[in-house]
Amino acid sequence: MNAFLVDGVRTPVGNFGGTLASIRTDDLAALTISELLKRNSGLDPALVGDVILGCANQAGEDNRNVARMASLLAGLPVSVPGETVNRLCASGLASAVNGSRMLALGDADVVIAGGVENMTRGPWVMSKASKAFGRDSSLYDTSFGWRFINPKLEAVYGVDGMGVTAENLVDKYSISRDDQDAFSFRSHMKATAARDAGRLAQEIVQVNIPRRKQDDLIFEHDEFIKPDTTVEILSKLRPAFRKEGGSVTAGNSSGLNDGSAALLLANESGLSSSGLTPLAQIISSAVVGVEPRIMGIGPVRASEIALKRAGITFDDLDVIELNEAFSAQALACIRAWGLDDDDSRINPNGGGISIGHPLGVTGSRILLAAARQLERTGGKYGLVTLCIGVGQGYAVVIKNTQ
């Protein structure tokens, strides 16, 4: 059997400390699951074979299997199980692939996949001392980056921060600051145009934020987009990760963001029994490992393998959703594929630099974005791909079924 993406919905992406900061991570995930079920009211919730959510943190309110907790909070029957997937930046894509495999095997006919991350609410964590009454405890902010580093791993592979890995790609592939800022500017302009034209709204469910002694705040647009930015403004920002000779800045990097997404997946049996119409077919996938110090190059080989498994080439693609962790990382991948920096197929409605990058959500967001873009344009094939911290790459090929 085959696996199909039927529908999907996401929250607007919130800034770090922004509009979604007051919402628990499990509640945020439940919100999009609940909306997905409302939008597909002909589906009996008891027929959902599994709820699979990506989440990269899992140290706070997203602990102890947030997918299961969100499923219950969304009102799904207790008989519907849940699983949380952690492949860092690609968690939301891995959840969809895991669900697709269940559908292909016939282990389920309908699956809800997706992802959640409230990076604002990532807690501090403290290690226990190595011995009773010891004083060698460590304290970490879990919102982003390494924690509890293994010295053996550090000795062999290093533990470069994500921004430093982007600087490593700048060095390796001779990517200029001007090109990075130009890429970032284009991302914001594309996202602004997509928002203003209502294309992003097709993916989004509004979030009502309770306020004391006031009406609820209605949150319905991604708040990380910067419509008024310019190349000149971006060029004035200081390097954020390498003070001397660096070129990766806050302006040409993705953000720390909050959000959730839910996707409805089904095989032919699930489509037929529930009267569902597929949006896209999941054709192939690939995941690879690369050197952790240049983790951003992971999409290159993963995409090449996924395309080969699908029996197509880059020339056959109508949309390419490449997560923009950093301008440098995206440009390194684009150039390695032999494509132009401004190829119109790449992130036509903006990407991680402009929309934001809530870690566990982005894979699901860009899978849905690619499917909706194919639906709008009548294109046939889409590629969805992300780099992953600690050196991996993930890619999925989809086919328009509309």
Q: Residue spans of the language-model regions?
A:
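Active-site-proximal alpha-helical scaffold in enzymes
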Residues: 85-117, 170-199, 262-269, 334-335, ...
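Conserved beta-ketoacyl condensing-enzyme motif
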Residues: 21-111, 115-134, 204-220, 293, ...
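N-terminal extracellular/periplasmic Venus flytrap/periplasmic-binding protein-like
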Residues: 10, 22, 26-31, 42, ...
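Active-site pocket-lining segment
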Residues: 165-167, 203, 211, 283-354
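Flexible glycine-/small-residue-enriched beta->alpha junction loops
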Residues: 110-168
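Short, well-ordered amphipathic alpha-helical segments that serve as non-catalytic structural scaffolds
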Residues: 25-40, 66-70, 95-98, 162-169, ...
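Condensing-enzyme catalytic core mediating Claisen C-C bond formation in acyl metabolism
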Residues: 1-23, 144, 230-297, 301, ...
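Conserved catalytic cysteine-centered active-site region
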Residues: 23, 55-110, 143-145, 156-162, ...
